[in-house]
Amino acid sequence: MLEDPMKQNVLQPLDKAEFRNVVGHFASGVTIVTAAHDGVPYGATISAVTSLCDTPPMVLVCLNQKLGTHAAIRKARHFTINILGEDQASLAHTFATPGADKFADVAVHHRQHGPRLAEALAYLTCRVVDDLEGGTHRIFVAEVVEAQAGTGNPLSYYRGRFGHFVPYRNAMWRTTQADNAVSPH
């Protein structure tokens, strides 16, 4: 019988570098989360974003509590998730850089619930319904109040690098969400 090599790590303390290495193996999309408070726009590149449910449409967003965007969302209680396209790595880098003039030379629609990046691949405007602390971050639970998707491919993030998504083509796999839906039978 083979010994599970991962079993030996189950009860061992996990150091920060090893944790970051392991979670870095999870590929994700790249977003810029924007908000405004007192007329000042804020934005940050965030990959810790996920859908929660579709009835009602809800998302989870995790932000470092040291970010100005975090403070703006806590006060405004609204934000927009701008999903980036594969050609927007430089924009993601700008919004990930502390101290950068993030909105310079960026086309922005100033909306009722804060700024939305005009060139985003897709966006979801959200209203915060709950938030909780998670270590250095805050987890925002939000209801989506407006959403729109364009065309194109998303920017991806994997092991500390930006890249693009290449769909796997296999005729045996179902390709539509309707085909993958769970049957009530």
Swiss-Prot record:
InterPro entries from the UniProt entry: Flavin_Rdtase-like_dom, NADH-dep_flavin_reductase, Split_barrel_FMN-bd
Gene3D superfamilies, alphabetized: Electron Transport, Fmn-binding Protein, Chain A
BP-aspect Gene Ontology terms: catabolic process
Keywords: Aromatic hydrocarbons catabolism, Monooxygenase, NAD, Oxidoreductase
Enzymatic class: oxidoreductase
TM regions (residue ranges): none
Induction per the UniProt record: By 4-NP.
GO molecular function, one term: 4-nitrocatechol 4-monooxygenase activity
Coiled-coil intervals: none
Keyword NAD: yes
Pathway(s) where this gene product acts: Aromatic compound metabolism; Xenobiotic degradation
EC numbers for this chain: 1.14.13.166, 1.14.13.29
Keyword set includes NAD: yes
Stated regulation of activity: Inhibited by methimazole.
Annotated catalysed reactions: 4-nitrophenol + NADH + O2 + H(+) = 4-nitrocatechol + NAD(+) + H2O; 4-nitrocatechol + NADPH + O2 = 2-hydroxy-1,4-benzoquinone + nitrite + NADP(+) + H2O; 4-nitrocatechol + NADH + O2 = 2-hydroxy-1,4-benzoquinone + nitrite + NAD(+) + H2O
Cited function: Involved in the degradation of para-nitrophenol (4-NP). Catalyzes both the initial hydroxylation of 4-NP to produce 4-nitrocatechol (4-NCA) and the subsequent oxidative release of the nitro group from 4-NCA to produce 2-hydroxy-1,4-benzoquinone. It can also use 4-nitroresorcinol as substrate with a rate of nitrite release similar to that observed with the two physiological substrates, 4-PN and 4-NCA.
Subunit: The 4-NP/4-NCA monooxygenase is composed of an oxygenase component NpcA and a reductase component NpcB.
Family to which this protein belongs: Belongs to the non-flavoprotein flavin reductase family.
This protein's name: 4-nitrophenol 4-monooxygenase/4-nitrocatechol 2-monooxygenase, reductase component
Organism, as annotated: Rhodococcus opacus (Nocardia opaca)
Gene field: npcB
